[in-house]
């Protein structure tokens, strides 16, 4: 998997307006794994793209009225079938972490990359998702080596607010896949 100017080659691009520049001299050193499903527990629709591009219709589902005002994004989404959608270039600051702290350092958006998995805290993620997440992570480590020792869940950087990627995410499996040499 290759990166060109912050974008994954071959990923579907859906540029989000919800990002800005990282602080001067800041590069990504942390990977944050999230999950998302819109409406909650449903997969495959257009709603994640709509949320991250600020175009979600608050009347399309009762839950959307609660989130339509949010200005959020992630760098990437990995759908259940393994499709990768990229919203923000990796060298820019996506708005995925919110109020957060990692190893005593606040404002995780400044120094992290956020990847969403289409899913829920309690439903097993798919083989395709693990394979793609590992491939993306290896590509990121090639560009940002510190990520290799700094991979965590949203629940770990915002434990009072967030639970994702939840107990369904198999961290050991993910780490084994990341550690495998690329072919």
From Swiss-Prot:
Job of this protein: Involved in cell wall peptidoglycan recycling. Specifically cleaves the amide bond between the lactyl group of N-acetylmuramic acid and the alpha-amino group of the L-alanine in degradation products containing an anhydro N-acetylmuramyl moiety. Is also involved in beta-lactamase induction.
Gene induction: Inactivation of AmpD results in AmpR-dependent hyperinduction and AmpD affects beta-lactam susceptibility in the absence of cloned C.freundii amp genes suggesting a linkage between AmpD and peptidoglycan synthesis.
Keyword field: Cell wall biogenesis/degradation, Cytoplasm, Hydrolase, Metal-binding, Zinc
Enzyme class: hydrolase
Gene this protein is translated from: ampD
UniProt-listed InterPro entries: Amidase/PGRP_sf, Amidase_domain, NAMLAA_amidase_2
GO MF annotations in UniProt: metal ion binding; N-acetyl-anhydromuramoyl-L-alanine amidase activity; N-acetylmuramoyl-L-alanine amidase activity
Record localization: Cytoplasm
Domain of life, source organism: Bacteria
Name of this chain's protein: 1,6-anhydro-N-acetylmuramyl-L-alanine amidase AmpD
